[in-house]
């Protein structure tokens, strides 16, 4: 049976993610105490229900991270496929969202401010984030989060999942990258008026960057680095590795390099391509 545990920071969009799981055909349970998870799985099996499970766990249920990881290992040992989805956002964004909704944080009390509660929650959940697929919703609306969840669900993962993410430095850097590479020193198609409207997926930009020796050298170097270290991460039983590639605007060079790497790594690793800012690529 496939079981998805959804966790993350309060205000980051866990409820939206859980609703998308339900719309995708999962049997969903919100805020389940972890000690009840084995009983839920057993009940599901006894009913001969083939529906996959999605369970939301967070600080409201008094989650014990050590217990959570033990439960995951135990369920996997019984042959279940257990995935962890972690939803987060930048603290400034979360503060704004709480202010707009006027809701209280689950950890807030007279002794802790909202910001202190958010920091404590982030520290508390970090060990769970380490083994999870992470979605940063700082620059997402609900529809975009739903799309990101659907894209993740499409991946049938049996081993290490390599997430190739492109972004623009002028919009900020991703906070969940395991490796980050900077493409801003490479020739920039943006300064060619004919190439500016295109993206790194379009043939005119592709042809231009294909002809740049520095660009090819950079791709070669990143491929060598990544393929050298990924086996080490697999040995540590990592489920996900995020490789972030950035350029100034996240439109030309970083997109091209991610697509080029994906072609080279295809067949060796399970891949998911993800972007942060290029909204015109959201339906790729």
Curated annotation (Swiss-Prot):
Residues involved in ATP binding: 8-15
Any Pfam family matching the protein: RapZ-like_N
Domain of life: Bacteria
Record keywords: ATP-binding, GTP-binding, Nucleotide-binding
Binding site for GTP: 58-61
Keyword Nucleotide-binding attached: yes
Entry's Gene Ontology molecular function annotations: ATP binding; GTP binding
Keyword S-adenosyl-L-methionine: no
Family indicated by similarity: Belongs to the RapZ-like family.
HAMAP family tied to this protein: RapZ_like
Record's function text: Displays ATPase and GTPase activities.
Protein name in UniProt: Nucleotide-binding protein NMC0691
Classification of source organism: Bacteria, Pseudomonadati, Pseudomonadota, Betaproteobacteria, Neisseriales
